[in-house]
């Protein structure tokens, strides 16, 4: 999430979060600078263990512009800003489920859970297919509390390996 003071700036109309708004990107630049300083020497290119970077989280599913083209462009903006700061890795990932934006050159990552504390009910959940051996998984129950989210994929699932960012037991 974002710090309260930044969310308040959006509520006052001073910036638009999770867009290419220059005022928002000013804070992204500061944030990426801090991360780059702390990650110095840990990137794969420097012999470190960091081989992947997730630029955004649930972007296009739970936040961000409703226009996919604008959302995809913003993801590329964030990646370029990260790379400019030295935050480079062999792999860049993006949330792949729920219509989240997965631009070209990003690996989609999915997730699955045994429980769904965000669900609007208390009845027993069906067993999750995410814990079975099969070629591809998409847990439709993840973030089912977000009605503004989009459904489906913004990438061709046949073109990518099955990777997870969230697999909770």
Regions found by a protein language model. Name each.
Residues 2-27, 35-169:
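Substrate-binding/catalytic cleft of secreted carbohydrate-active enzymes
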Residues 30:
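Alpha/beta-hydrolase active-site loop
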């Amino acid at each position: 999430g974002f710090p309260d003071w930044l969310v308040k700036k959006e509520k006052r109309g001073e910036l638009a979060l999770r867009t290419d708004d220059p005022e928002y990107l000013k804070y992204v630049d500061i944030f990426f600078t801090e991360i780059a300083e702390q990650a110095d020497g840990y990137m794969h290119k420097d012999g470190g263990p960091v081989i992947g970077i997730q630029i955004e989280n649930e972007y296009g599913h739970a936040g961000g512009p409703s226009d996919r083209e604008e959302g995809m462009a913003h993801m590329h903006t964030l990646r370029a800003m990260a790379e400019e700061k030295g935050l480079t890795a062999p792999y860049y990932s993006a949330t792949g489920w729920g219509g989240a934006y997965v631009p070209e050159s990003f690996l989609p990552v999915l997730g699955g859970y045994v429980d769904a504390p965000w669900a609007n009910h208390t009845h027993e959940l069906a067993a999750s297919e995410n814990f079975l051996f099969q070629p591809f998984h998409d847990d439709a129950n993840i973030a089912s509390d977000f009605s503004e989210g989009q459904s489906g994929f913004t990438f061709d699932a046949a073109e990518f390996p099955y990777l997870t960012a969230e697999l909770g037991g």
